[in-house]
C-alpha cells in the first residue's frame, strides 16, 4: 500500500515541546495525579456511605428480629405497620411491594424505585423498562414461591407492612441459586397493597 512502511515501525520515545505561555504553565503530571487522587477520594467516600448504610440496616433488622414472632417452622415476622384490611388466606392472591436483603443488611432486590435510590442501587435497565413495580403473589399451595415468603405473607392482612426473617431452609436452601449463595438467610420487607383476582 502507498505510504505504509514495509517493516513495522516502533515508537521508542516521545518528546513534547511546549509552545506558548499556557502550554508551558500546563502541568500534565500534576493534573494526572490530582485526577486519580480525586477518583480515589470519591470511591472512598462511596464505600464509607455504603458501609454506614449497611451497618444501619443491619442494626434495624437486629432490633426488629428481637421483637418478632417465631413460628414453629423457624420463620420470624414482625408487623411494623398494621393495616385495616382482610386477613390473607392460603389461596389469596395479593399485590405487594417488597425489598429483600441478605442477613448482613445488603440489598438483594426491591420492587420500589425510591428504596433503590436511597440505597444507591438503582438498576438502570430495570428502571428503563419500568420494572420497579409491585408484584402479584399467589399464596395457593401449588404457586411457585419460596416457602418462607409464602408462609410469611399468610400471617398478614391487607395494608400491613412487615419484616419477614426467612431461614435458608425456607428460602433457597443449602444450594442457593445464581445470585444467592448457599445457606443464605433472607430478610424481606413487605407491604400488602390489595387483594387481586
Report residues per predicted region.
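Cross-family detector of peptidyl-prolyl cis-trans isomerase
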Residues: 1-197
Amino acid at each position: 500500500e502507498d505510504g505504509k512502511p514495509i517493516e513495522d515501525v516502533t515508537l521508542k520515545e516521545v518528546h513534547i515541546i511546549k509552545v506558548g505561555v499556557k502550554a508551558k504553565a500546563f502541568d500534565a503530571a500534576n493534573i494526572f495525579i490530582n485526577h486519580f487522587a480525586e477518583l480515589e477520594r470519591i470511591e472512598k467516600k462511596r464505600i464509607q456511605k455504603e458501609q454506614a448504610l449497611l451497618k444501619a440496616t443491619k442494626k434495624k433488622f437486629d432490633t426488629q428480629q428481637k421483637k418478632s414472632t417465631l413460628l414453629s417452622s423457624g420463620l420470624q415476622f414482625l408487623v411494623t405497620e398494621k393495616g385495616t384490611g382482610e386477613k390473607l388466606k392460603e389461596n389469596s392472591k395479593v399485590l405487594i411491594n417488597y425489598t429483600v436483603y441478605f442477613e448482613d443488611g445488603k440489598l438483594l432486590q426491591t420492587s420500589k424505585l425510591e428504596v433503590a435510590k436511597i440505597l444507591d442501587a438503582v438498576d438502570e435497565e430495570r428502571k428503563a423498562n419500568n420494572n420497579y413495580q409491585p408484584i402479584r403473589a399467589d399464596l395457593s399451595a401449588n404457586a411457585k414461591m419460596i416457602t418462607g415468603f409464602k408462609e410469611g405473607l399468610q400471617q398478614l392482612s391487607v395494608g400491613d407492612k412487615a419484616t419477614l426473617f426467612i431461614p435458608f431452609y425456607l428460602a433457597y436452601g443449602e444450594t442457593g441459586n445464581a445470585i444467592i449463595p448457599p445457606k443464605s438467610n433472607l430478610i424481606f420487607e413487605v407491604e400488602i397493597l390489595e387483594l387481586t383476582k
